[in-house]
């Protein structure tokens, strides 16, 4: 029996997940020590409860997926609207280095997936599905490549396997990022910081770095900000249809990001509009939390248990590889400092899961140890935009090599 939740009940369920997550993180020291994001903590509890209900009583729940997608698009729009070109210039060489590090990891991820799949007697394409298609690419990329593999190469169940693998990555990307960064930070001897009210006021315009900071916004600024969000979403809808017909078939969230960047910089440069970053920050962080909560509510653990043993082995090895790469490559190449540790947490997030997971990982660290402007400048831009272009190019090369 399946119970369907409409958008209202889905929103209620997501907020309950967030409240449970907040309570758990507040009460359980282990979750705080490992910097587990509140949506991940609450979402996993919800997923386990839904799994038990399914196994014992055959009950499943269907939550409103378009609402989850909408919050994801709003989150990426907020990243674009926060991307002032004058700030992006500050990315400089670290932005280039991090992009190269991420690109190299995509290649490593696919070699690990294909190598293990071949060794275990599976189709190499399954290695790509348990590689960067689902782990770096996420659910959107899995949904795009899965039907293609089924239609062109007869790989039965590719889409379902892709969805399950992407879900695995989303969960573990949120679980490993905090512990990896915390271990690196502890080694350098950095201590947790006290976030005083004065600190919060001084840093009020730093977007996404501390989701729990109090921000003062007005009804007027909220309406103006909502108008910009609506314009970006409309732009993304138009470009998504045009893109599928004539261009590269990029995910819609890329167009949300791009639209936000364009609108932000045209308004500030050409019309001298004073952007109200605090309102953008509030909408972006709220959307991020709700997206993650809904994604985990839609997690069907019984589908993960249905994964073949070899596929589970591949995904487990990929998780270990991500931890090692973030620790010994990402952290080292980005400078072996606090910013590098936060970047490593972010890389774990979108290297296995998605950019929202990366941001949640970094927020859990900066809330404890203080801000990292560099990480919050670089990770959203690379994770939301550059990584999809690089991943598409690398995947095309791998597929052509094995099936060309």
Language-model-detected regions and their locations in the chain:
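Flexible hinge motifs at transmembrane-helix junctions and intramembrane kinks/re-entrant loops
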Residues: 24-40, 57, 61-64, 183, ...
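Juxtamembrane and boundary regions of transmembrane helices in multi-pass small-molecule transporters
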Residues: 115-122, 166-206, 320, 325-338, ...
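Intrinsically disordered, low-complexity non-transmembrane regions of multi-pass membrane transporters
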Residues: 1-5, 11, 18-20, 182-226, ...
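Entry/N-cap segments of selected transmembrane alpha helices
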Residues: 84-114, 226, 282, 297-327
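Structural signature of hydrophobic alpha-helical transmembrane segments
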Residues: 2-16, 62-75, 125-132, 247-259, ...
């Amino acid at each position: 029996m399946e119970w369907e939740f409409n958008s209202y009940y889905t929103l209620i369920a997501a907020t309950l997940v967030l409240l449970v997550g907040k309570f758990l993180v507040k009460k359980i020291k282990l979750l705080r020590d490992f910097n587990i994001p509140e949506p991940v903590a609450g979402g996993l509890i919800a997923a386990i409860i839904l799994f038990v209900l399914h196994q014992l009583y055959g009950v499943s729940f269907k939550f409103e997926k378009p609402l989850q997608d909408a919050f994801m698009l709003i989150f990426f729009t907020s990243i674009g609207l926060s991307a002032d070109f004058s700030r992006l210039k500050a990315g400089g060489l670290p932005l280039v280095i991090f992009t190269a590090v991420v690109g190299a990891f995509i290649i490593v991820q696919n070699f690990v997936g294909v190598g293990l799949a071949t060794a275990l007697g599976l189709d190499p394409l399954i290695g790509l599905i348990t590689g960067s298609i689902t782990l770096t690419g996420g659910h959107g990329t899995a949904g795009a490549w899965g039907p293609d593999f089924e239609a062109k190469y007869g790989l039965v169940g590719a889409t379902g396997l892709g969805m399950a693998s992407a879900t695995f990555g989303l969960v573990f990307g949120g679980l490993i990022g905090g512990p990896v960064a915390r271990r690196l930070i502890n080694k350098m001897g950095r201590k947790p910081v006290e976030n005083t009210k004065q600190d919060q006021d001084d840093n009020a315009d730093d977007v996404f770095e501390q989701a729990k900071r109090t921000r003062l916004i007005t009804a007027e600024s909220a309406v103006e900000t909502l108008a910009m969000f609506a314009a970006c979403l409309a732009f993304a809808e138009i470009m998504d249809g045009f893109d599928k017909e004539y261009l590269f078939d990029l995910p819609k969230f890329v167009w949300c990001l791009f639209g936000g960047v364009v609108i932000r910089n045209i308004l500030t440069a050409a019309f001298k509009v004073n952007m109200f970053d605090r309102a953008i920050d509030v909408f972006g962080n709220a959307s991020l939390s709700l997206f993650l909560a809904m994604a985990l509510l839609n997690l069907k653990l019984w589908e993960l248990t249905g994964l073949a043993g070899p596929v589970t082995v591949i995904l487990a090895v990929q998780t270990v590889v991500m931890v090692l790469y973030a620790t010994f490559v990402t952290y080292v190449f980005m400078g072996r400092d606090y910013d590098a540790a936060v970047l490593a947490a972010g890389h774990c997030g979108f290297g296995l899961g998605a950019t929202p997971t990366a941001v949640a990982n970094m927020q859990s660290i900066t809330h404890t140890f203080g801000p990292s402007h560099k990480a919050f400048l670089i990770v959203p831009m690379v994770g939301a935009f550059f990584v999809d272009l690089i991943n598409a190019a690398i995947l095309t090369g791998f597929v052509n090599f094995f099936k060309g």
